[in-house]
Amino acid sequence: MASTNTNLQKAIDLASKAAQEDKAGNYEEALQLYQHAVQYFLHVVKYEAQGDKAKQSIRAKCTEYLDRAEKLKEYLKKKEKKPQKPVKEEQSGPVDEKGNDSDGEAESDDPEKKKLQNQLQGAIVIERPNVKWSDVAGLEGAKEALKEAVILPIKFPHLFTGKRTPWRGILLFGPPGTGKSYLAKAVATEANNSTFFSISSSDLVSKWLGESEKLVKNLFQLARENKPSIIFIDEIDSLCGSRSENESEAARRIKTEFLVQMQGVGVDNDGILVLGATNIPWVLDSAIRRRFEKRIYIPLPEAHARAAMFRLHLGSTQNSLTEADFQELGRKTDGYSGADISIIVRDALMQPVRKVQSATHFKKVRGPSRADPNCIVNDLLTPCSPGDPGAIEMTWMDVPGDKLLEPVVSMWDMLRSLSSTKPTVNEQDLLKLKKFTEDFGQEG
């Protein structure tokens, strides 16, 4: 109960201090204090407040403080922008009570724009995924095209002047699990000076009529404000399929807005790259397809890339596999995607755990101590067959937690997992993708 009073008192103190700063005209300090106060109030409502009446009263106060914070934020934004936007004397019209030019740009729909842009803020990838180009096995053509479109224009802007302009739209297509989204993660990591928007259909589709296309428009406006920007749309076919008589009016309007924003009259998309990914490119609308200037096929990995994937997925886990074993695994997995190989390795990594679970005998071995890896001890226990010299009859339940030395991953574990994992891509889909590549794409 004491902590409730402490947090509530802290929130009340912050709110009264914010009101004082607000009255004194120190709007920046007031804004920060209002925001902190609201955070404390919300914490109290969520975890500490007792009774509906108390919660209702705190929520009402929160709404009041949030409204004031929004007004202050808007005022401070306008104050920053005003010197940058000179108005010709003959054009300066009457000013309304809010301080807006009545015949200038209408600011009445600003709150709506702000609300839509706030919805899209969650799509901005702030924490960069830690995926480097070297983590992507194979796909050299796709990597080069992405470096050409994203990294080079940021590092050497002087190269892209006059008629030489970077690519504005790149479509990655191919079977599921081949690394299209993984490549996008690598782009997000490597393009560290760019704003990266990761968009799915749920970010742009709204139940309210007319709001979806406004979200699309605001997405591109947000990208222009924060350029250089990359807009990554995963499973773009769900938003931009072929237009037909049977589709809904809302879907048609989203598509039209996409077409206008990607390459419309009076639209400046300098410094913006739209990156799309799909498994079924043949369902894309032809006009959307044309907006993606580069269409790169991400095929199933070849034998050498598959061998590299086994190596990458095993990482630093102790194993007894040789280079020849990796090459053999690469040859044996023809028709498997990168995601399939990841599942094989994950299953193989569980095989030593299963050996521990099913073992009836353990033996003492030398190995690094759990407490200090630099110290070698002689009393670790590892699973063994009943006929092994020094075999002790016991189950894993009898082994002390810090004394277990699990078996290393072996080629036998890999082959066992491979035999129980089937490829997820069928021949029919591959033929369709190859046909699409021949007609419209290029090999990655």
Swiss-Prot record:
Family matches, as SUPFAM superfamilies: MIT domain, P-loop containing nucleoside triphosphate hydrolases
Membrane topology designation: Peripheral membrane protein
Catalytic activity: ATP + H2O = ADP + phosphate + H(+)
Domain of life: Eukaryota
Recorded GO MF terms: ATP binding; ATP hydrolysis activity; protein homodimerization activity; protein-containing complex binding
Location of this chain's protein in the cell: Late endosome membrane
Annotated positions binding ATP: G174, P175, P176, G177, T178, G179, K180, S181
Residues the record lists as Phosphoserine modifications: S102, S108, S410
Example GO biological process: ESCRT III complex disassembly
Expressed in which tissues: High level expression seen in the kidney. It is also expressed in the heart, brain, spleen, lung, liver, skeletal muscle, and testis.
EC class name: hydrolase
Positions with biased composition (Basic and acidic residues): 86-101
Keywords: ATP-binding, Cell cycle, Cell division, Coiled coil, Endosome, Hydrolase, Membrane, Nucleotide-binding, Phosphoprotein, Protein transport, Transport
Subunit description: Proposed to be monomeric or homodimeric in nucleotide-free form and to oligomerize upon binding to ATP to form two stacked hexameric or heptameric rings with a central pore through which ESCRT-III substrates are translocated in an ATP-dependent manner. In vitro, associates on the inside of a helical tubular structure formed by a CHMP2A-CHMP3 polymer. Interacts with CHMP1A, CHMP1B, CHMP4B and CHMP6. Interacts with CHMP2A. Interacts with VPS4A; the interaction suggests a heteromeric assembly with VPS4A. Interacts with VTA1.
Function noted in UniProt: Involved in late steps of the endosomal multivesicular bodies (MVB) pathway. Recognizes membrane-associated ESCRT-III assemblies and catalyzes their disassembly, possibly in combination with membrane fission. Redistributes the ESCRT-III components to the cytoplasm for further rounds of MVB sorting. MVBs contain intraluminal vesicles (ILVs) that are generated by invagination and scission from the limiting membrane of the endosome and mostly are delivered to lysosomes enabling degradation of membrane proteins, such as stimulated growth factor receptors, lysosomal enzymes and lipids. (Microbial infection) In conjunction with the ESCRT machinery also appears to function in topologically equivalent membrane fission events, such as the terminal stages of cytokinesis and enveloped virus budding (lentiviruses).
Entry text on domains: The MIT domain serves as an adapter for ESCRT-III proteins. It forms an asymmetric three-helix bundle that binds amphipathic MIM (MIT interacting motif) helices along the groove between MIT helices 2 and 3 present in a subset of ESCRT-III proteins thus establishing the canonical MIM-MIT interaction. In an extended conformation along the groove between helices 1 and 3, also binds to a type-2 MIT interacting motif (MIM2).
The family this protein is said to belong to: Belongs to the AAA ATPase family.
Protein's name according to its UniProt entry: Vacuolar protein sorting-associated protein 4B
